[in-house]
Every structure is written in structure tokens, then in C-alpha cells.
């Protein structure tokens, strides 16, 4: 199956005993998610970075987004996010949309556990080549500053596995 102009955003969790598994079932080719610049969400580190020229907040397009989720397995998918059809958007445009194939984000729930990315084919993810601190590229795993850090603690990960993934033709 090809999911053209579609994306997957997971903002819920499985459990250690019963993780959420997203992947192929049955026979045939791997399902392909072609986000085409869709799946837009807002990234905010929560604090300015060390240089005023470094972008620390803005919109990102992700074909697959795991946001504050845990105990998730994403496997055996083909993922693209190139959006060639956006008129006037070219490779070195300074305000080009940031894009990822897969973005994994921890922010407001403390420690996130059990994230597995396995046997993913990620290609043709063409985002902004300048915003080096924004989620931008094939696979991007980020911990952002929580809104209520005094309550949730620092956002971070434990037990993350990325294996057997092949990433090519991405702009960052």
C-alpha cells in the first residue's frame, strides 16, 4: 500500500508487556508513507539556543511522528517526505520547511521508554539545510524542555533501539 500525502502521528503509548507495533502485515511490499510535506507539527526547545541565529522553534513536517509516546515499535516501512510539488520551494531556500522521515520527541512526560525503529527504508526527505537544531533529516530523536519541568522532570529516553534502517537522499 502507498499512503500518498499522508502521515502517521502517534501521541499515545503501549506498555512494556504490549507495545504498539506499526509495520507490515501479510505478504507483499512494505507499506510506503509518502508525506509530501504534510504531518506538520510545532517544535519548540523551550529556550533560546546559544546563538541568536540558531532557530529553536518552528514548524516541522514528519512522515512519522512519535510525540511523548513510549513502548512503540515502528518496523518494515518505506518512508519519504520530499514535497516536490510545492511551487517556489527549492533546495537552498532559507525558510524551507523542516522535514523528517521519522521524528521521535520527548517533552512533557519525563522519561520515555521502549522506542524501536527497525528495518525502515527512509529516503527523499528534503528539508531545510540551514536549521541545524530543528528536527530535519531521515531519523531525528529529540528531548525538548518540558513546559512544567518541575513536575515532570527532564525529558529523556531509556531503551531506544534503531537497527537495520537504511537512510539515503536526505538533506540533513
What are these regions (language model features)?
Residues 14-95, 124-130:
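Right-handed parallel beta-helix/beta-spiral solenoid domain characteristic of secreted/periplasmic
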Residues 5-10, 40-65, 88-108, 130-157, ...:
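Extracellular beta-strand/beta-solenoid scaffold signature
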Amino acid at each position: 500500500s502507498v499512503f500518498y500525502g499522508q502521515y502517521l502521528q502517534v501521541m499515545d503509548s503501549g506498555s512494556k508487556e504490549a507495545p504498539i507495533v506499526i509495520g507490515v502485515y501479510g505478504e507483499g511490499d512494505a507499506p510506503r508513507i509518502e508525506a509530501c510535506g504534510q504531518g506538520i507539527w510545532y517544535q519548540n526547545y523551550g529556550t533560546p539556543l546559544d546563538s541568536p541565529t540558531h532557530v529553536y522553534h518552528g514548524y516541522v513536517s514528519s512522515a512519522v511522528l512519535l510525540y511523548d509516546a513510549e513502548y512503540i515499535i515502528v518496523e518494515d516501512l518505506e518512508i519519504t517526505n520530499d514535497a516536490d510539488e510545492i511551487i517556489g520551494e527549492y533546495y537552498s531556500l532559507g525558510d524551507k520547511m523542516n522535514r523528517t522521515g521519522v521524528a521521535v520527541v520527548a517533552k512533557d512526560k519525563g522519561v520515555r521508554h521502549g522506542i524501536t525503529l527497525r528495518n525502515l527504508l527512509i529516503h527523499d526527505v528534503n528539508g531545510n539545510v540551514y536549521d541545524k537544531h530543528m528536527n530535519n533529516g531521515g531519523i531525528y530523536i529529540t528531548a525538548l524542555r518540558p513546559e512544567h519541568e518541575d513536575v515532570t522532570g527532564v525529558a529523556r529516553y531509556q531503551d531506544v533501539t534503531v537497527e537495520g534502517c537504511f537512510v539515503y537522499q536526505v538533506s540533513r
